[in-house]
Amino acid sequence: MLTPPWQVVECQFDVKHECLNIYLDFLRGSHFPCPDCGQEDCAVHDTENKSWRHLNFFQHETFMYARVTRIKCSNCGVRLINVPWARADSGFTLLFEAYIMMLAPSMPVQRISELVSEHDTRLWRPIHHHVKEAREQADHSDVKKVGVDETSSKRGHNYVSIFVDLEKSKTVFATEGKDNTTVERFKDDLCKHGGDPEAITDVSCDMSPAFIKGVEENLPNAEITFDKFHVLKTLNEAVDEVRRQEQKG
C-alpha cells in the first residue's frame, strides 16, 4: 500500500479523542508520473493537505495525513497525483473501503455506519463506486439457469426483483418492480455482459403471471420451474380454505 517515495514520518496517539494519527510524506526531490497521460518524472508544483480514515488500530479510529503533490506535466499542465493508499477524491483508504465492502453483503449500510462511526452517506459513495466497477467487468456468458424472486425494498409496496445464477449461487441482476418488464430488463442486461437470452435453459420463479409472461417473451428456450416454497404455500392455502369450508358445513 505504501510505496516509495512515500514514507511514515510520524505517529501520534490523541489521548483526548482516543484516535491514532499517522503522518506520511514524500522524500525531498521526488518526482511523480502524471495521473492523466502517464508521463514520468514530473516535478512537484505544490502540495495539498489531505486526510483519510484508515482501519482501526485495535479499538481506536485511525487517520492518515499527507501533503499530496500537484505535479507540472508538460502535456497536461498542473495535476493532482494519485496516492497508492486511496482512490482519488475518497476520504477513506483502500483498506478501509475493502473492509466496508466485506461487511456490505451481510448487513444494512446503516448498521455498518454505526459499527465504524461514519455517516451512511459517506459509506454509500465507495459502495456505489466498487459495485459499478464490478458490474462493468461482469461476464454472464456462462449463465444458463436462473432463479428470480421479488422482495420488498421498503415498507409498503416497493418491490425489487432479483435474478440469481443458480449454478453459482450468485446475484447477477436486480431491478425495481415485479412485473413482466423486469425479465425484459434482465435480458437486456444479460446481453450487455456477454450473455445470451436464448442460452437460458431453466428459470425458477413463483407462480406470478407477470414472471411467466416475461420469461415466455424474453427467454424463449427456458423451461419454467415453480419454486418449492411457493408451491407449498399455495397448497397450504388451499388446504386451509377446504378446512374452513368444512368447519362452516
Residue map of PLM features:
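Edge strands and adjacent loops of beta-rich recognition modules
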Residues: 2-5
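Short, positively charged, Gly/Tyr-enriched micro-motifs
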Residues: 38-41, 51-158, 198
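Core catalytic machinery and nucleic-acid-binding channels of phosphodiester-processing enzymes
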Residues: 68, 115-126, 167, 207-209, ...
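RNase H-like nuclease fold core
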Residues: 124-202, 209-214, 241
